[in-house]
A protein has these predicted regions:
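Short amphipathic alpha-helical segment with a characteristic S/N-K-E followed by hydrophobic residues
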Residues: 13, 51-57, 66
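Hydrophobic/aromatic-rich alpha-helical bundle segments in the mid-to-C-terminal region
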Residues: 106, 138-180
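Hydrophobic alpha-helical connector segments
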Residues: 58, 72-99, 152
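Amphipathic alpha-helical packing segments from all-alpha helical-bundle domains
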Residues: 65, 97-100, 115-142, 146-150
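Base-recognition residues in the alpha-helical recognition helix of bacterial helix-turn-helix
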Residues: 22, 46-50, 58, 62
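Short hydrophobic/aromatic patch on the recognition helix
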Residues: 17, 39-49
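Short helix-capping/turn signature of helix-turn-helix
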Residues: 49, 107-115
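Basic, helix-initiating cap at the start of DNA-binding domains
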Residues: 1-24, 28-37, 54
């Protein structure tokens, strides 16, 4: 039972930290705030994570694995009648300020120099996502190019910037419709 309690505390700390990082950024949230909001001692925190960098890395790994699972489910599901519906679901999953991708997106801009190992986690996910989108495109368009998957990921990033600036999902949807018509 003790391991289950320890696991619960570590998981709570991961999710608390992820939410704080999404709201305030990686550099404005310190260990003190995380342990306070996760209701754990600093000693317990360092016992689980050893450092803030390791915590960030684990937060990003959790987000990455959740996203991979969801993207695979979308790309393998037969419930979507065509490519347009699959791409729409992948796009909407990522172009969301409350979603798992937003933390990985923030990491690209905020942690490169301070936390290089965690930064690599975010880059690896983007590379994986581009490859996955390429194969989704390739299944329906025999002449799909890798550049199209690059454009799709850049479009997701642009939608996030748009949401940060105006917080209007309408702009996000307009961008997607333009891409899908091409």
């Amino acid at each position: 039972m003790k391991n289950l309690e320890a696991s619960f505390r570590a998981t709570r700390a991961l999710y608390t930290a992820a939410e704080l990082f999404k709201q305030h950024g990686f550099n404005k949230v310190g260990v003190d705030r995380i342990v306070s909001e996760a209701k754990m001692t600093k000693a317990t925190f360092y016992n689980y994570f050893h450092s803030k960098e390791r915590l960030i890395e684990m937060c990003l790994l959790v987000q990455k694995e959740q996203l991979k699972e969801k993207v695979r489910a979308i790309s393998e599901a037969r419930q979507y009648p065509d490519l347009v519906h699959q791409l729409r679901q992948i796009y909407l999953l990522h172009a969301d300020l409350k979603g798992a991708y937003y933390l990985l997106f923030k990491a690209i801009f905020e942690i490169k120099k301070l936390y290089p190992n965690a930064y690599q986690t975010a880059l690896r996910y983007r590379r994986w996502l581009k490859n996955e989108i390429f194969w989704v495109l390739r299944e329906s368009k025999k002449r799909a190019t890798y550049e199209e998957s690059d454009i799709f990921v850049f479009m997701i990033d642009g939608a996030i910037f748009g949401l940060l600036g105006t917080d209007q999902a309408k702009d996000r949807d307009t961008l997607l419709e333009y891409f899908l018509k091409r």
